[in-house]
Amino acid sequence: MVQPHDHKSASPQDTVTSVSIQLLLFVDDRPSSQENIEQIQEHLERLKSEYPYDLQVIEIQQQPHLVEYFRLVATPALVKIVPEPRQTLAGSNIVDQLNKWWPRWQCAIKEAQDAQKVHNETNNQGDGDSPLNSVGYSAELIRLSDELFRLKKEKEELAEQIKFKDQVLAMLAHDLRSPLTAASIAVETLELANNQPDSPRIVQLKEQLYQQTRKQFRIMNRLITDILQASKSINAQLQLQHTHLYLQPLCLEILKQMGDQFQEKSLKIEKDIPQDLPPVYADEELIRQVIVNLLDNAIKYTPEEGTITVSILHRTTQKVQVSICDTGPGIPEEKQDRIFEGHFRLKRDEGKEGYGLGLSLCRKIIRAHYGQIWVDSTINQGSCFHFTLPVFR
């Protein structure tokens, strides 16, 4: 990697003793850039004999805030910060551009030196250090400005998180009340039924009450799970544990585990999952979470005796596509993009448990795997959710 020239240390505390041409050379670590960078530095070294200057070489990986501040779009790039106005040279012909602009910069710096001399004589000052003209000082000022902007942004994000959590707690308290009340009534009725002599009617009533109680507890569990998942996605970046993952056994395992939920609504499950699928490069637990969430939604919106289809396609050598389809009410076309937003709910969801936070988390997980997730849906015909994952190589 190219190191800073001896003309100027990279320390922000360094200052220069007079007004001089001051340059920032932005470089990267690409091998293809090294020859161009060396040519620029060699040419600057030759120019030094004509006129002194101060140069700081900046590696963009170490100081990205400077890249953003100077709005650089390519490297290498040479930025002249003194004399003003600031000027950026970029592209493959920086040496030619230097030859064009160097005489003009010399004239401008001589004018600045004359003005500085008059100012010093007027104010009875010597040629002391001029930190305002220091490359290091300018870089430090930019860094502090960038840090202030970052802290303001973090403050705004934290305020949004606190606001969201307050909203979620209020929603949770409100939505938990209904299933909790229903479960309490069912338990109290069971207590009364246990004091009655057994009869076919009492046995049937108990079974119905048990089912009702289990259903209400599942609703409460779903509400709490939604909140926990959303909290994780907001408070921390996803920690992916990539491995070569075989989707066929994972999908079959999940379908088996959710069998009781399918049977409860007499749903028909259709599978099109080839055995010769290549492994994907993914985090098993996070992908399991995505599949379970999409199947949960399919169960919730598919009417009794409806059909849910799970299929996996390997259309290219680079990715695998998973699709989960239902025969539910469908999603309006104008709403299909918004359902992946964290707090968006369709009108059909107003009577459903959950907050619709699951699809937002699914999108975050799939994007973290460099995949895509989307929905195809037709009103009154059903919806198909698709996502892709990269093939393991």
Swiss-Prot record:
EC nos: 2.7.13.3
GO molecular function, one term: phosphorelay sensor kinase activity
Domain Histidine kinase: 171-393
Xref: PROSITE patterns: HIS_KIN (PS50109)
Entry-linked CDD domains: HATPase (cd00075), HisKA (cd00082), KaiB_like (cd02978)
Catalyzed reaction equations: ATP + protein L-histidine = ADP + protein N-phospho-L-histidine
Subunit structure: Homooligomerizes. Interacts with KaiC. Participates in the KaiABC clock complex, whose core is composed of a KaiC homohexamer, 6 KaiB and up to 6 KaiA dimers. SasA and KaiB(fs) compete to bind to KaiC.
Protein name as catalogued: Adaptive-response sensory kinase SasA
Annotated gene: sasA
